[in-house]
A protein has these predicted regions:
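Cofactor-binding loop segments of dinucleotide-utilizing enzymes, especially the Rossmann-like FAD-
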Residues: 64, 97, 150, 183-185
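Short internal beta-strands
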Residues: 92-99
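Membrane-anchoring hydrophobic helices of lipid-metabolizing enzymes
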Residues: 1-83, 87-91, 103-108, 112-115, ...
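Short, highly charged C-terminal tails/helix-capping segments
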Residues: 10, 244-270
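Generic beta-sheet signal
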Residues: 57-63, 142-149, 178
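Hydrophobic/aromatic beta-strand patches that form the interior of the parallel beta-sheet core
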Residues: 95, 117, 179-183
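A conditional alpha-helix N-cap/helix-loop micro-motif detector
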Residues: 124-129, 161-162
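A cross-family acyltransferase "interaction/gating" segment
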Residues: 105-108, 143-144, 155-225, 255
Length: 273
């Protein structure tokens, strides 16, 4: 990566660090306005904090992708407001698709201040290579990077195990002493992909530290194999999510049946009135 690009990254990092005192409270206010909630929020934050404390080096944070604000929601779920301000370096850099925000100057500014490196998906390979080079440079300097290995929002509403991107595989291959954190997060009302989650949605999140199996392949094959391992892990976490959701639903149905059995159903009339 050339010197000019490095300087621009450091300038962006400095400006973002200065603006976090305003940006972080604004984002947290948005979660209140949209009434978004995360199950076991304290435990999720405790778990992520503990993992970051165990490994002080770079992290690649890999998550499923269903809405255009997933990065924001993941940041809210894993870092408290205080951690946003006091632990700015631990906040991951994000890779949003440029065409999703480039036509709105407010979104452009917010993305710049929120540690975002725009990606031109489907654009020239040289341009994509420069973006990936920036991420590798950041990781080698102890920063964290958040990436959606699927390469875009899943149109089926499930982890895309076929058309995924190989970019995350390059990070695993090229950056030593780098840990991978897989996060599966989904709202109860999220049946497919969307621009933003439904108002008042409640999210479930799982965190797993994943160590990809070493492979003998090199070049693009190595990138693909590493990326496939991460995608498969996210798919397993997705199955766990739906299994837990079915269990919750069965528990609710059982509770309702017990209420009705003991005469507590709301639809029944009280014979003592």
């Amino acid at each position: 990566m050339d010197t000019k690009s490095k300087v621009f990254l450091h300038v962006q990092d400095f400006i973002g660090r200065s603006a976090i005192f305003f940006i972080a409270p604004f984002y947290f206010l948005l979660t209140r306005i949209f009434f978004y909630r995360v199950r076991d929020l304290r435990e999720i934050r405790r778990q992520s904090t503990a993992e970051f404390a165990k490994h002080k080096g770079p992290w690649i944070i890999c998550a499923n992708h269903l809405t255009m604000v997933d990065s924001f929601l993941l940041g809210y779920a894993t870092f408290s407001l205080r951690q946003h301000i006091t632990g700015y370096k631990r906040l991951p850099w994000n890779l949003p698709e440029r065409r999703n925000f480039q036509s709105n100057i407010i979104l452009v500014v917010l993305c710049y201040l929120s540690k975002c490196i725009p990606v031109d998906r489907g654009g020239p390979r040289e341009k994509l290579k420069k973006t990936l080079d920036k991420c590798v440079y950041l990781l080698r300097n102890g920063h964290h990077v958040m990436i959606f290995p699927e390469g875009g929002r899943s149109r089926s509403g499930r982890v895309n195990k076929e058309g995924f991107s190989y970019g995350v595989g390059r990070f695993v291959r090229d950056v030593e002493n780098c840990k991978v954190m897989c996060i599966y997060m989904r709202g109860d009302k999220q049946h497919s992909y969307s621009v933003i989650p439904s108002w008042g949605d409640k999210f479930s999140a799982q965190i797993e530290v994943f160590t990809p199996e070493p492979i003998a392949e090199t070049g693009l094959r190595a990138q693909r194999e590493y990326a496939a391992q991460i995608i498969n892990r996210l798919a397993q976490m997705e199955e766990n999510y739906f299994a837990l959701r079915r269990e919750r639903c069965r528990g609710f149905e059982g509770f309702r049946e017990r209420e009705e059995k003991h005469g507590f159903a709301l639809s029944e009339k009280n014979s003592h009135r």
